[in-house]
Every structure is written in C-alpha cells, then in structure tokens.
Amino acid sequence: VHGELRQTWAQTYARCRRLASSLQRAGIAKNDTVAVMLPNTPPMVEAHFGVPMAGAVLNALNTRLDPETIAFMLDHGEAKAVIVDPEFATVIAKALTLRQSKAPLLLIDVEDEVYGAAELRVGQQTYEEFLAAGDPQFAWELPGDEWDAIALNYTSGTTGNPKGVVYHHRGATINAISNVLEWDM
C-alpha cells in the first residue's frame, strides 16, 4: 500500500525479479554495490530483495545526510548504480558533483506519485522504465556462501568519515529467524 497503489506479494516478487534481471543486464555483477536513496516506498522494499537477487550488495543511504557525506559513501562503497526518489534528487545531484571517483554510475529516477512531480532528474531513465526491461520470471540464485555480503551500511562517522559495515546473508537470515521467534509469529 502506497498512496493509491495496491500490490500483492506475487506482484512484488515479480517486480523484485524484474529489478534483479535489469540490474544484471545493465552490468551489475556479484558483490557490486547498488546505492538507494529512497523513503519507505515500494521501490525501497523491492530494492531490499531485488538487489541481493542480482547478487549485488544494497547500500541504503540515510536520507538525512548531506551531499558531502553521500558523495563519500558512493565513492567508498564503490557504488555502480544509484536509485533515487525525487524527494532526494537535489542531494544526490550535489553529491554526484562532489565524488572523487570518475567511474560511471547507472542513475535511476523513481517517479513517486505520492511525493509529486520531480523538479530535478538525475537519472538516465525512470525506475519503471528500468523494471520494464527486466524478466518477471528471472531465475535468481541463492548466494553461494552464507557469508556473502547482502548489504553495506555506514556508521554515523562521529570520529571522522562514516565507516562501512558489511552485513552478510547469514546474519540477515539469523536476524529474520530471531524476529519470528521473538515476536511469536
């Protein structure tokens, strides 16, 4: 549920598979970092599943950070792609000018009807255009090793630049099982 959008879990799964497929078609490979600067919207949920389905590592950027810190994280995490909501396009646009790396980035704009029309676009294409090229039946594979990275998060950087913290599939699985047990699901 997001604004007027109603989507089943089957539809969400197909969209996650499309995202994974599209990322791989765009050259995103195992252990590549895909950064996202999104609020709690369907594309954020899809990224949490679709990015690992592509074998890539999700870097969910803190939406309250300044462009300088975002630029550092994009460089340090060696992001290969960035998916951005229009709400944060100005911050991302500025961060892109501050990057030290000259490596090209795949930039994808989410069109968020709840937020409104984008005043600024930073991407080469929209998220829906990107997904449309993907395969809803994409045959994704489980990680080959439970210690493979699933996410890259950053500390607050109170003693300098933020520090990258890598999460692995094993930790994500154990955390999910712990939640089921703790919440008596």
Give, region by region, the residue ranges found by the protein language model:
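Conserved AMP-binding/adenylate-forming core of the ANL superfamily
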Residues: V1-T41, V45-F49, D66-A71, E128-E129
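Conserved AMP-binding A3 loop
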Residues: T8-A10, I150-N175
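Structural core segment of the AMP-binding/adenylate-forming
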Residues: R25-A26, M53-A132
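Conserved short alpha-helical elements in the N-terminal third of ANL/AMP-binding
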Residues: G50-A54, V180
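Conserved pre-ATP/AMP-binding loop-to-beta segment of ANL
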Residues: I108-D109, Q124-Q125, A132-Y154, N161, ...
